[in-house]
Amino acid sequence: SGMVVSPGFIDMHTHLEPIMEMPDAKSLIMQGVTLALGGPDGGGPWPFGSYLDSLEQLGTGPNLAYLIGHNTIRREVMGNVDQAPTLSQMDSMKNYVEMAMKEGAFGISTGLKYLPGTFAKVDEIISLSKVASSYQGIYTSHLREEGLGLIDAVQEAILISKEAEIPVVLTHHKAIGVKMWGASVKTLSLVDSARKEGL
């Protein structure tokens, strides 16, 4: 009496870095989370497949899924340099995304506010997201900007979704600073319009 029964919750943005030390993940289970999606904000494990193998051998409390992190693979290929990738570097990153998708990644994440993702132009993200899309993956993004550039950042994420034909999840969708008060009316309108287009 007075209780509610519901399906388990899916946590779409989980920093699972301590999972090897706390595999039971009691804090998630106690909140009703039965599936946690790791690798947000462009971060995540590398090498991807061997990390998942280690988790499987360890055993975890909740079900876990992971995204391949753009920052992780960009750093692996290019370091933290502020430049566009060469064709060879782009091919390497695409190969890493494809390999991770084949190894079980649920999609790709970006942290365009963080190094080295902040150096990536939209075309780079679209190209990599197309690879994830070809395996029915999703795209999640810590937006490039949450303050004065918020509207442009939301438009960028929607453009990536449209061009790569991939579902997008906006993480940390917030308007920072007094000058941005009320901007969420505009950004939520952009999201609603994108959803109506099937994105």
Where are these regions (language model features)?
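Divalent-metal coordination cores built from histidine and acidic residues
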Residues: 3-4, 14, 22-110, 129
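Short, proline-centered helix/strand-breaking motifs
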Residues: 6-7, 138
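Metallo-beta-lactamase
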Residues: 7-17
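Histidine/acidic residue-rich metal-binding segments in metalloenzymes
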Residues: 85-110, 116-199
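Short acidic-hydrophobic sequence patches enriched in Asp/Glu that either
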Residues: 20, 24, 43-47, 124, ...
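A generic secondary-structure signal marking the coil-to-beta-strand transition
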Residues: 8, 60-62, 166
